[in-house]
Structures are given as structure tokens and as C-alpha cells.
Amino acid sequence: ILAGYGYDMIGVDNSGDMLELAMEKRLASGHDILYLLQDMREFELYGTVRAVVSVCDSVNYITEPEELAEVFRLVNNYLDPGGLFLFDFNTEYKYREVMGDCTIAEDRGDCSFIWDNCYYEEEKINEYDLTLFIREGSDDNGALYRKYRETHFQRGYTLEEIRELLSSAGLVFQAAYDMDTGEAAWEKSERICVIARECGKRPPEESGPAQEAGESRQAQGAREV
């Protein structure tokens, strides 16, 4: 999506299967996107970038706060001076009060799933077993459903914890929005989008007013996207 807006993109994922799917979409889109097979806790780039974007509650998969602080430190390291970091996360409130211990099942025609959820409040760990039934073939050729099973572990974080971890990594918190309402995040937000900024690096001394104005416009575009 962002490549379609004209941004030069680098994609990082720890799953070869996910990257393979991404590369298939890249081929279909015609965009020039670099993909890297890396663990976010140890990711390396070839230089700094103007923005880092993390979506689909990826940070919740980092279940140790110390490791998440290291992820944020790496983000800060690879951001340009004043660069933006945008990410979303599921809150502890959502896991504790909304999800809890439950089973969710849904039939979507070509695929169905069973989601068995369990939240361990003391450890702040949400575990869910996901069983998928994916349709293959057509009715004319004898369609069948192939079964897949996955187990996921995610940690519930509060916004206060996220802000403290950002600060410990040298990033400056800018804003947090409830992803259901678009309004400012509050204590009962289930999913939050956070905007943070790098502030520790100095821009090149030769940067003139025109260049700085251009960077300001590009940063504004990143916020709007």
C-alpha cells in the first residue's frame, strides 16, 4: 500500500512463508520492494530510513519487555533524525476483559476457523490455538478443506508500559489513537496506534532551509498515511 503512494519500502519478517507471499504480491504490483528475512529483535538495515511502520500487533509477539525495549532501540538507531515510528498493539485491557478465556468459530465459505483463547493474567500472556480449514479446488473437481493448526503467544501491554519502553530506547512519544474510534486512546482502548519520533541524532550540517522544508513536508505525508 505505502509503495503505491510512492514510498521506497523495505519489508522485514521472520517468516519465510510470509515473505514468499509478499514477494508474489510484489511481482503482481510491479513495485520495487526489498524484503529481508530477519527477527525484529535483531534486525539490521543498510542505513537509516525516514519512517518505520509495524502493523498487525507485531509488537505483542515480543513477550518480554526487555526484548521489546531492544526492538525500540534498534528502530531508534535506524531512523533518520526526526524520523517517525508508527505501530499498533493490542492492549492488556483487550486480552483481559474482552478476549479472556473463550472460543470463537466462524464459517466464511472458502475458509473456516476455530479460535481457542486463554489469557494468563499474572503473566500477561495471551495464548490462542487457531484451527483453520481452507478450501481447495472447486465443487466440480471435488473440493476439499485442508486443516491447519497454529499456536500463538502474545503479551498484553498498557499504553503506559509502551511509553516507558519507548523512552528507555531514546524515542519520543508523540500520540496514541484508539484504532476503533480514531480518537485519543483511553483506558478501555482495545487496539492502539502509537506515533513516536527519533530525537537523538543531528541532521547533516549542510542541510539548508529548502531541504529542511522538504523533509518537513515528507514527514507530514508519512503522518497522513
Regions of interest found by a model, annotated:
Residues 41-51:
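A short acidic, Gly/Pro-enriched loop at the edge of an enzyme's catalytic core
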Residues 153-212, 221-225:
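C-terminal lobe and adjacent flexible extensions of AdoMet/dcAdoMet transferase-like proteins
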Residues 49, 124-126, 187-192:
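A short, glycine/Asx- and small/polar-enriched loop/turn
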Residues 86-165, 225:
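SAM-dependent methyltransferase
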Residues 49-67:
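A short SAM/SAH-binding and catalytic strip from SAM-dependent methyltransferases
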Residues 69-84:
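A short glycine-rich, Lys/Arg-flanked "PGG" loop and its adjoining helix->strand segment in the class I
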